[in-house]
């Protein structure tokens, strides 16, 4: 891990991108518009070998750091960002997401408790998203809330499009596995095994909008891939019936919206 220097920012934000020209500009603009004092947040974008106009789009902006990672894969790109990050909290989102203006403020507030090792946020979809997708999104948020708050490490999963981790966690247990998928889930699983006293929390105030999807069937197809790849995590267990019922009950009561 890179040595942490004095007077660091409070939060380092790491965003990998690969051929992300469709949404990258909106992502960068949302991060530059964050409610933050000068020097409080550093923005690190990592180009993972884009062949479209993504690099040119990123070059249009001042106030961000752009790095390059030749090893294919978003987790390799995230690890490159982690190595240079200077803040005690490292936050992650994706190039097809826009963050709320108070996103970093909510992350800082949510991680005030020193027992919180990692934080997962709330995901919305665009205004033109279908009703089934909005319902599916609410269910996924409810699922994250229940798993983070009530389930053991073996059941944990995470999404890097809205996630914050203490830098010390990477120093202690290592970076993301450079897998194609599920390394975010593996990281919080590994944190629970190595640092069981630390909490994984869900904070609905930490909000992003995921621009990639507008139809439920496309998102459901992606979720099936995540479910399949979670099986590569050593010791991972699928949710049991009682856990799934707890999620359903929480969702029916309005959780995740």
Where do the language-model regions lie?
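Short, acidic, metal-binding catalytic loop of nucleotide-sugar glycosyltransferases
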Residues: 30-40
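A conserved hydrophobic helix/loop-capping motif in glycosyltransferases and polysaccharide synthases
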Residues: 11-23, 27, 34, 46, ...
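Conserved donor NDP-sugar-binding/catalytic core segment of glycosyltransferases
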Residues: 102-133
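Active-site-adjacent helix/loop segment of glycosyltransferases
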Residues: 200-203, 209-257
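Glycine-rich, basic loop-to-helix element that forms the pyrophosphate-binding segment
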Residues: 69-85
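Short aromatic/hydrophobic "clamp" motif used to bind/position activated sugar donors
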Residues: 90
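A conserved acidic beta->alpha catalytic loop
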Residues: 30, 47-56, 97
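A recurrent flexible, glycine/aromatic-enriched loop bordering the glycosyltransferase active site
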Residues: 125, 146-164, 180, 186
């Amino acid at each position: 891990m890179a040595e942490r220097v004095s007077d660091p920012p409070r939060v380092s934000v790491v965003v990998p991108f690969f051929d992300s020209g469709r949404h990258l500009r909106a992502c960068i603009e949302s991060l530059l518009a964050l409610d933050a004092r000068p020097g409080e947040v550093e923005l690190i974008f990592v180009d993972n070998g884009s062949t479209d106009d993504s690099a040119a789009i990123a070059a249009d902006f001042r106030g961000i750091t752009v790095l390059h990672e030749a090893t294919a894969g978003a987790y390799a790109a995230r690890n490159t960002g982690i190595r240079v990050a200077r803040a005690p909290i490292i936050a992650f989102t994706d190039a097809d997401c826009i963050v709320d203006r108070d996103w970093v403020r909510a992350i800082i507030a949510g991680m005030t408790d020193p027992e919180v090792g990692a934080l997962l946020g709330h995901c919305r979809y665009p205004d033109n998203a279908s009703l089934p997708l909005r319902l599916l999104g609410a269910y996924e948020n409810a699922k994250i809330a229940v798993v983070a708050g009530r389930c053991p490490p073996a059941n944990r999963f995470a999404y890097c499009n809205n996630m914050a981790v203490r830098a010390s966690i990477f120093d202690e247990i290592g970076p993301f596995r450079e897998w194609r998928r599920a390394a975010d889930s593996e990281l919080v699983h590994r944190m629970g095994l190595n640092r069981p006293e630390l909490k994984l929390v869900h904070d609905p105030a930490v909000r992003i909008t995921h621009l990639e999807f507008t139809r439920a069937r496309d998102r459901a197809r992606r979720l099936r891939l995540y479910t399949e790849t979670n099986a590569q995590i050593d010791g991972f267990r699928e949710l049991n019936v009682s856990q799934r019922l707890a999620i359903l009950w929480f969702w029916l009561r309005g959780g995740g919206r």
